[in-house]
């Protein structure tokens, strides 16, 4: 089984509508893959029903409303023996061709773990919605999550990856796509100011400041 995993809680349309939008995009961007949404009890029923209506979507209802520690739910499949490969994504981002080309390159390589960074602000070892793992790459993920002292704060998953996951990985088993910090280009040219991990609201508006930062970085890169 090939999985695209998401965590979802609350009623903020930035995330709930984003979840629906990613479910709509998945068959085109990731044909043959399934989406699995880990959903807190705080998500409105109509959103849950819409997700359940997609044939390629699995909804796993959690028994708690959800908070920032819910970010970890989507990481669980890395430990499941029937999951061939999984990629973890954010509901406020959008699946796209640029990331899929990077995933395809990783899938064809003899590497178990995949990391993407595609913006000057992506200065973390592993971003919770921009990584993937093949079966066996980190089989103790569930146990590691259970043992980690999670906090209800944005970025708690970044700390987990930096302190627990990354030190346990062997460098030769990791493929990184990142032109900013590692200097490994994505396999497809950047179209305009697009970037993997770009955040959108429920009306498909992005964050202008993020675009400006990327534009300035690329402009300076060309000058050099």
Give a label for each model feature.
Residues 1-64:
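N-terminal anchoring/stem segment of glycosyltransferases
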Residues 65-73:
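A short, glycine-/small-residue-rich helix N-cap motif at loop->alpha-helix starts
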Residues 74-82:
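A short acidic-Thr-Gly-centered motif at the start of a beta-strand
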Residues 77, 113-115, 130-132, 160:
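Conserved hydrophobic/aromatic beta-strand scaffold that supports enzyme active sites
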Residues 86-88:
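Short aromatic/hydrophobic "clamp" motif used to bind/position activated sugar donors
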Residues 92:
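Short conserved active-site loop signatures built around small residues
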Residues 95-126:
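Conserved donor-nucleotide/metal-binding helix-loop-beta segment in metal-dependent transferases, i.e.
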Residues 121, 133-224:
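Catalytic core and acceptor-binding pocket of nucleotide-sugar-dependent glycosyltransferases
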């Amino acid at each position: 089984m090939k999985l695209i995993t998401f965590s979802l809680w609350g009623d903020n349309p930035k995330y709930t509508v984003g979840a629906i939008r990613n479910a709509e995009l998945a068959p085109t961007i990731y044909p043959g893959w399934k989406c699995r949404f880990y959903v807190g009890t705080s998500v409105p029923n109509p959103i849950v029903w819409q997700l359940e209506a997609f044939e390629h979507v699995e909804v796993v209802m959690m028994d708690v409303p959800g908070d920032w520690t819910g970010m970890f739910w989507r990481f669980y499949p890395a430990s499941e023996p029937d999951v061939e490969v999984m990629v973890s994504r954010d509901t406020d981002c959008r699946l796209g061709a640029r990331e899929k080309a990077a995933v395809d390159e990783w899938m064809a390589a003899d590497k178990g773990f995949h990391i993407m960074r595609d913006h000057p602000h992506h200065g973390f070892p592993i971003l919770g919605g921009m990584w993937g793992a093949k079966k066996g790459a980190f089989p103790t993920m569930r146990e590691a999550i259970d043992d980690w002292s999670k906090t209800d704060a944005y970025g708690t998953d970044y700390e987990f990856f930096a302190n627990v996951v990354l030190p346990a990985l062997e460098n030769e088993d990791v493929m990184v796509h990142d032109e900013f910090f590692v200097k490994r280009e994505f396999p497809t040219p950047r179209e305009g100011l697009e970037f993997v991990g770009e955040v959108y609201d429920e009306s498909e508006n992005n964050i202008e400041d993020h675009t400006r930062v990327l534009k300035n970085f690329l402009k300076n890169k060309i000058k050099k």
